[in-house]
Amino acid sequence: MSFLSESFGDTVTPIPVTTISTGEYEPLDVINLKNIRQVYKTDKSENILFDNLDFNIKDIAGEGQFTSLLGKSGCGKSTILRYIAGLQKPTSGEIIIYGKEKTDEDRIPMIFQQYSSFPWMSVIENVALPLIIKHVNKTEAYDKAEELIKVVGLTGQENKWARYPLLSGGQLQRVAIARSLVANPKILLLDEPFSALDIKNRNELQNVLLTLFKNPTIDVTFILVTHDIREAVYLSNRLFIMKSNPGEIFKEYKIDLGHNRDQSIKYSQKYIDYVQTVEQDFNTLA
């Protein structure tokens, strides 16, 4: 449950952050993780997940970012999301959000693999809930919820109970996405949100995210954790591969498939080249 790019042309070369050319737009630091150290201790051992990890997401073009984190199990991808969401603190280090150190009061929505809703409430009640909690007028809250319900493709489902089997798993994830965005967050975290869905629902939900990302009234930085290279390339304009022991950034890519991409881009040579390049680098990891 959620709480409540400039172009390479046809090149797919991984680049360090320091080489990014920003043109006339001054890049905005969205997220900065500095000198992050994460140690898990037991009576008999000490496991170091991160040892002075640095991780940065910038809004390069002034249009938000869709960033994906790839990596094998245990490299710390989901832990990074938990830091940003405020669900976990590192052993040491700084977490900076839009130039300010993150506090316990900060709430950043996060969507997980297992869909979650309040099953005793309707779809529109679920989506409007974060605004109701903030004491927004009910009419205003429901109007905003209706807008997002339409964007995520649930028109006509507003008054259904938000539970399975009245709604499918894919529909319940749409409810979660709409609820996470209704209070106008600047960041949305996605931890393997579609891995439990069939390919049809997965493709449809990918398109929902792209529709939201392209919507000029929804200014959100999306951060996706996934094991699916094709999904990461399709959705992202920035992509990171992580390695483990200790967890750190291994490669970084800018993905230039255009802001108005759709499923047909998956048949293009440019998309295929990106996927092959990322796969080759990913497969070098131990």
Each model region followed by its residue ranges:
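Helix-to-loop junction immediately C-terminal to a conserved catalytic motif
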Residues: 85
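Conserved ABC ATPase "signature" region
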Residues: 139-158, 210-211
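Conserved ABC ATPase signature
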Residues: 163-167, 171
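Hydrophobic anchor residue at the start of the ABC signature
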Residues: 177
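Conserved catalytic motifs of ABC-family nucleotide-binding domains
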Residues: 184
